[in-house]
């Protein structure tokens, strides 16, 4: 089995916060699209599974969509 190096450090935290707030990946994608951030459900899955990078403006959008300070992603 080949281990893949994580492509981001906050994906698991995004998943945890999203689930605690009862938000589906589909709902999160819709909230991001309202902000004109083009991320769909499969991309959110990849971010949460740490197989896709996340850009700075996407982190900001996730913060707004999940109603948490950006710092919470790094705790």
Across the structure, where does each feature detected by a protein language model lie?
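A detector for short, charged/polar N-terminal pre-domain segments
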Residues: 1-9, 74
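Short basic helix-loop element that most often maps to the first helix and adjoining turn
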Residues: 12-33
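Conserved hydrophobic/aromatic packing and binding residues within compact polymer-binding modules
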Residues: 14, 28-29, 44-47, 73
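Helix-turn-helix DNA-binding elements, focusing on the entry/boundary residues of the two helices
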Residues: 14, 25, 41, 56-59
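Recognition helix of helix-turn-helix/homeodomain-like DNA-binding domains
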Residues: 33-53
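DNA major-groove recognition helix of helix-turn-helix/homeodomain DNA-binding modules
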Residues: 51, 55-72
């Amino acid at each position: 089995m080949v281990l893949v190096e994580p492509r981001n450090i906050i994906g698991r935290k995004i998943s945890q916060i999203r689930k605690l707030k009862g938000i589906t990946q589909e709902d999160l994608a819709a909230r991001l699209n309202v902000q004109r951030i083009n991320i769909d459900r499969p991309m959110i899955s990849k971010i949460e599974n740490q197989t896709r990078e996340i850009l700075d403006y996407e982190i900001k959008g996730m913060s707004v969509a999940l109603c948490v300070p950006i710092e919470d992603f790094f705790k």
